[in-house]
Swiss-Prot record:
GO biological process, one term: glycerol metabolic process
UniProt-listed PROSITE patterns: RHODANESE_3 (PS50206)
Occurrences of domain Rhodanese (ranges): 17-105
Family: Belongs to the GlpE family.
EC code: 2.8.1.1
Keywords for this protein: Cytoplasm, Transferase
Species annotation: Pseudomonas putida (strain GB-1)
Pfam families listed in its UniProt record: Rhodanese
Main location, first listed in the record: cytoplasm
SMART domains with a match to the protein in the record: RHOD
Name of this chain's protein: Thiosulfate sulfurtransferase GlpE
SUPFAM superfamilies documented for this protein: Rhodanese/Cell cycle control phosphatase (SSF52821)
Amino acid sequence: MSEFKRIPPEQALELRKQEGAVVVDIRDAQAFAAGHITGARHLDNHSVADFIRGANLDAPTLVVCYHGNSSQSAAAYLVGQGFSDVYSVDGGFELWRATYPAETAQGAAE
């Protein structure tokens, strides 16, 4: 079984450009609506099963939380579910927003 990798925002920005790459944001819905990485999908306990069922388990999957701590547990969980290319973004959305403010969006999850 593979393990997830911890990466800085700079590497996440590059990985995000790969075809099929997915960014999942595990923060609460209100925080997600207030701001998230452009193109990110909100993931919570209610949506994770549907996400896993429809996911390409081999696609780069980047997990983001507030500061890069909770995302590590979520990334490990996804690896345990069969995902093979999982990353936890160090510094979370807070560091991403500070580093790449133009690469953020607002609005509720679809």
